[in-house]
Amino acid sequence: MKREGCFWKGICMRYKSYSAYDSQGQSQIKEIYETSFPKSEKFPFWILKQCAKENNVHLNSIIDHNTDKIIGMSFLISYDDIAYLMYVAIDKKYRNKGFGSLVLKDLILRQADTSILLCIERPSTEKEDIKARRKDFYLRNCFYETGCFIEDSGVEYEFLSSSKERVITENDLKKRYSCMTRNPLIKFIIKNTFDSNINFID
């Protein structure tokens, strides 16, 4: 299903490929990425740019259709029957306005024939923990627990899915990295940035 944009509760937004921007627009997308994720969870941005040259990898801006301003970014990898949402972020100036919820709901509509997977840092048992609030946000917006937890470079992660009955396999997780690019050098860097061996935990 091809959709140019989406509208929900008075909010209207659309997407635009990173490669379609001039240097100023590209810098805005990079800044949102760099300021939205901890260093331990990020690839160097140039790797995202190179990987986005693949047909199955999408590095996009998220645009407020009413103002034509860049308000966020997303990085999505498609393989098999999975769309892996590696990164999605709304600029801090535009958070708590409904854009994040709209992005997730729209992605689920766009990827109706696939399971959207994403991972979050595993929450603690404290309800006020920011990680727990982040998880609750995804659960409120049509994502489900999968019971899949891994440890990578000393950080524990939990995987969520847009498909309620999705069973995540080791192969599913390995492919989220191996399908990012066909470039041997970048594959090597990716492999050495995050652990390519899947360490499942309880």
Feature-to-residue mapping (PLM):
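Short amphipathic alpha-helix that is part of the acyltransferase structural core
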Residues: 4-46, 171-176, 188-195
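Active-site rim helix/loop that mediates acceptor-substrate recognition in acyltransferases
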Residues: 34-66
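Conserved beta-strand in the GNAT
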Residues: 61, 68-77, 82-89
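A short, internal acetyl-CoA/4′-phosphopantetheine-binding micro-motif in the GNAT/acyltransferase core
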Residues: 88-95, 122-124
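Conserved acetyl-CoA-binding loop-helix of GNAT-fold acetyltransferases
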Residues: 90, 96-110
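Conserved GNAT acetyl-CoA-binding A-motif
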Residues: 111-129
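Conserved catalytic-core motifs of GNAT/GCN5-like acyltransferases
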Residues: 119, 133-135, 139-158
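C-terminal "cap" of GNAT-fold acetyltransferases
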Residues: 131, 151-202
